[in-house]
Amino acid sequence: MIHTIRLYIEKYRLLSEDRPVLVGLSGGADSVALLGVLVRLGYPCIALHCNFHLRGEESDRDEAFACEFAESLEVPFHKIDFDTISYAGERHLSIEMAARELRYAWFEEMRERLGGQATAVAHHRDDNVETVLMNLIRGTGIRGMSGIRPRNGFIVRPLLCVSREDILAWLADQGYAYMVDSTNLSDAYTRNFIRLNVLPLLEEINPSARNTIARSAEHLSAAETIYIYVLEQARKEVVVSDDRLSIGALMRFPAPETILYELLKEYGFTRLVSDDIFAALTKEPGKLFYSSTHRLLKDRDYLWITSLEKKEKRTFVLDPEKGINHEPIELSFQKLVITIDFPIEKNKRIAYLDYDKLDFPLTLRTWKEGDWFIPFGMKGRKKLSDYFSDHKFSRIEKERTWLLCSGDAIVWVVGERTDNRFRIDESTKRVLIVNFLG
């Protein structure tokens, strides 16, 4: 296994031996193997451990083990404690997303402080397979199907070339102990569900399913390199200026519909709106299309793109009965009858509203001076301008923020916070779930 990892590091030029390598060490099998292998290969390592305090005594047990293991290899050890639950609540993030943000921010802080060349994390081949399947289920393009990258900035993943089975066999051979995270044995999370339920079913069809998916991801990663190259060539010819695309140049490329989407998504246009724009290319000029930040005008020979900041404010009328509204941003709507054990996900991109407190139709608009709402969990009014200031919104972020409204009342600062007047309470009978898709 060590030889395989050495070749992988060399192939992708992940590490050199002249500067320290920071290593994320949770205490689990994968990170223990990662540190052990890198030390064996001669890299100067520094171990980093995050205690998220999410699993009671298990979290403290893992920290103690990680410290002892690093000391046994004579590797410097640094650790940090996080109040993950409070961080997630303050930012309306899932626990998983909060832990991810905290971990990688600290890793980068420590890399800069200690002069590290990179931070190595312990994603392996099976993690990559699970990621590909998750992206496929959620809907993705070639980038999502190519899986986890060996390098992402200063984060490197030397174990992507080996499987979980390889890692466990190597640990047993070396006599290394490791900690087991009890949550990894639960299928409560999507990734664990795929690991424990979906992959075993796929292996009944093809016992080599993991290897096959991993190889496919590697091939797609190579194909993505070609894809990016062609896209850059198209950009040079199609993008005449910051606000103008040439229809004629676009149509000379293969797969022009895909190229158009790749160019337009930088301006906030969804795939569905991009498809509508492409369909309009052969029709009469003059039609307008909107993203959350820009307006596009289809002219005879060009697509003209202008920022909504420079244009008159516009209000969009929404119809929750359609299920999904695509313009100017993509929102999905679901009406449910509430039950005693009704689950509420803590996610800034999802709003749970009392259906019977709303006046329809709902509307979507950008903010204006004098706007106010009652933030969820509060009793008093707050000017939206003050909310923006408190949360350090830039001018562009303010202009790009959309407000879901019921009559004159702001129901939801989309992607941020709902209004307390429309919250679910003990009298709620029906719930409207609004999901910000992009």
Swiss-Prot record:
Keywords tagged on the record: ATP-binding, Cytoplasm, Ligase, Nucleotide-binding, tRNA processing
Molecular function terms from GO: ATP binding; tRNA(Ile)-lysidine synthase activity
Catalytic activity as recorded in UniProt: cytidine(34) in tRNA(Ile2) + L-lysine + ATP = lysidine(34) in tRNA(Ile2) + AMP + diphosphate + H(+)
Gene Ontology BP, a term: tRNA modification
Protein's cellular compartments: Cytoplasm
Highest taxon listed in the record's lineage: Bacteria
This protein's domain notes: The N-terminal region contains the highly conserved SGGXDS motif, predicted to be a P-loop motif involved in ATP binding.
UniProt xrefs under HAMAP family: tRNA_Ile_lys_synt (MF_01161)
Protein name as annotated: tRNA(Ile)-lysidine synthase
Origin species: Parabacteroides distasonis (strain ATCC 8503 / DSM 20701 / CIP 104284 / JCM 5825 / NCTC 11152)
Lineage: Bacteria, Pseudomonadati, Bacteroidota, Bacteroidia, Bacteroidales
